[in-house]
Amino acid sequence: WKKINTPWGKPSDEILIANVGKEEICFIPRHARGHKINPTNINFRANIDAMKQLDVTDIVSVSAVGSLKENLEPGKFIIADQFIDRTFSRIKTFFDEEIVAHVSMTKPTSPGLSNCCEAALKKLNIKNQKGGTYVVMEGPQFSTLAESRLYRSWKADVIGMTNMPEAKLAREAE
């Protein structure tokens, strides 16, 4: 475990650095070890900056989500390629003081990395769906039935609380 200091404050936790095969990986428990930080209070800027300081070039973000579609049974991995950001209390950019930048989020995920994830899941015989829309809600409460119906009408696949602004900040940090 390695402690990283950032100009954005403390990351959620220390970073676990390990070797998996020939690759070095870095893992940060975004809710902290022991699941102590609620989704709204995660310091996403510090987490992404810590990864940048460690020269991380690719991020695979794993999240617990709920299904909005009957055909997405529990245990099936969704390799999301789109997000609907319904968060409202989180800092969503590195560019809020002294400099403004406009970063495209048209394609918020890497097709190459998505292909790698799909191949790894298939190799492990884990059910998966490549492509899907992830609604990110503020939390920590779950959505109302009316909200879930709305998101289904938008053709969203899954709902969770943690991938925004994480994906936006990762794109800005590229």
Give the residues covered by each predicted segment.
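Non-catalytic positions within long, well-ordered alpha-helices that form the structural scaffold/packing
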Residues: K52-D55, R152, R171
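Generic non-transmembrane alpha-helical segments
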Residues: G112, C116-K127
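Active-site/ligand-binding-proximal alpha/beta "capping" segment
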Residues: K123-D157
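A structural signal for small-residue-enriched, beta-sheet-centric alpha/beta enzyme cores
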Residues: N163-L169
